[in-house]
UniProtKB/Swiss-Prot annotation:
<dbReference type="InterPro" id="IPR013762">
    <property type="entry name" value="Integrase-like_cat_sf"/>
</dbReference>
<dbReference type="GO" id="GO:0051301">
    <property type="term" value="P:cell division"/>
</dbReference>
<dbReference type="InterPro" id="IPR050090">
    <property type="entry name" value="Tyrosine_recombinase_XerCD"/>
</dbReference>
<dbReference type="InterPro" id="IPR044068">
    <property type="entry name" value="CB"/>
</dbReference>
<feature type="active site" description="O-(3'-phospho-DNA)-tyrosine intermediate">
    <location>
        <position position="285"/>
    </location>
</feature>
<keyword id="KW-0132">Cell division</keyword>
<comment type="subunit">
    <text>Forms a cyclic heterotetrameric complex composed of two molecules of XerC and two molecules of XerD.</text>
</comment>
<dbReference type="GO" id="GO:0005737">
    <property type="term" value="C:cytoplasm"/>
</dbReference>
<feature type="active site">
    <location>
        <position position="276"/>
    </location>
</feature>
<dbReference type="InterPro" id="IPR004107">
    <property type="entry name" value="Integrase_SAM-like_N"/>
</dbReference>
<keyword id="KW-0229">DNA integration</keyword>
<feature type="active site">
    <location>
        <position position="253"/>
    </location>
</feature>
<feature type="active site">
    <location>
        <position position="159"/>
    </location>
</feature>
<dbReference type="InterPro" id="IPR011010">
    <property type="entry name" value="DNA_brk_join_enz"/>
</dbReference>
<comment type="function">
    <text>Site-specific tyrosine recombinase, which acts by catalyzing the cutting and rejoining of the recombining DNA molecules. The XerC-XerD complex is essential to convert dimers of the bacterial chromosome into monomers to permit their segregation at cell division. It also contributes to the segregational stability of plasmids.</text>
</comment>
<dbReference type="InterPro" id="IPR010998">
    <property type="entry name" value="Integrase_recombinase_N"/>
</dbReference>
<dbReference type="InterPro" id="IPR002104">
    <property type="entry name" value="Integrase_catalytic"/>
</dbReference>
Amino acid sequence: MLDISIQELIKQWQKYLILQKNYSNNTVIAYNNDLKHFLEFMNYYNSELVTLNHIKTADIRLIRSWLAKRKCENFTASSIARGLSTVKNFYKFLEKTLLLNNHIIFSIKSPKKAKLLPKGLSVDDVLISLEHIEEYGNVKWVELRNKALIVLIYAAGLRISEALSITKLHLQNLEFIKIIGKGSKERIIPWLPLTKNLITKYLEILPYKLDENEPIFRGRQGKKLQPSVFNRELIKLKRIYGLPEYLTAHSFRHSFASHLLEYGADLRSIQELLGHKSLSTTQKYTQTSIKHLEAVYNTAYPIKK
């Protein structure tokens, strides 16, 4: 249980994340779940209703006990690190709005995350997906929507949240699309004729009237399409055609980067297209490319035979 004043603070924090920090709804939901888990543990730890004073006086033992509990509950290192980052974010908000300081929180280092390489699809997997995704919509406009979404993500390297935020206003420029990504970072991506043609065909048969600033990708009931709904369409696809288990909407973004690198694009350009703040994030794809080259070498290099 939480004190009513704490509940109100959490609502203000969520508004701050959306309006000031430009976080996506999915990110805010994840952050809210992390904070809820932390405050529930604080409630258990102190054996009483959490108040602002409990938050202000939280010590290093409490934080470390909470992190240990998450580890015991089989949270991944990445999830544990994100949880701590969420708590720090909340405390920064309190420091800014209430002048509430708790520097102990910021002294705790995040657990080391396993460095997982991004998993992209092969070109063949992408082509199979494009060829067969239209078989699972049952309604023509849904089938076209699914295909247009895959092409958009793969051809432009968009995050699923970015793709699902595309409006008719984005279609007005014939040469490029302007994306506002994480942290309000703006990037410009060229339109491919195939992408725009598919989206245009989809909009021509979409049974719902949309304003120019409304997201164009809609669910069957006319509401904004949710990532989970689209990923369910992909689950059907990969089960029937034996596609990789890691095939998701986001895997097409990874494939965009990996395939550009394999075909000679430079890292800086890929960084700009993906909207990565740091080049080190983009450099993960060089490891993926090296793995690909090693596989080709091991199976095809004539001297090895």
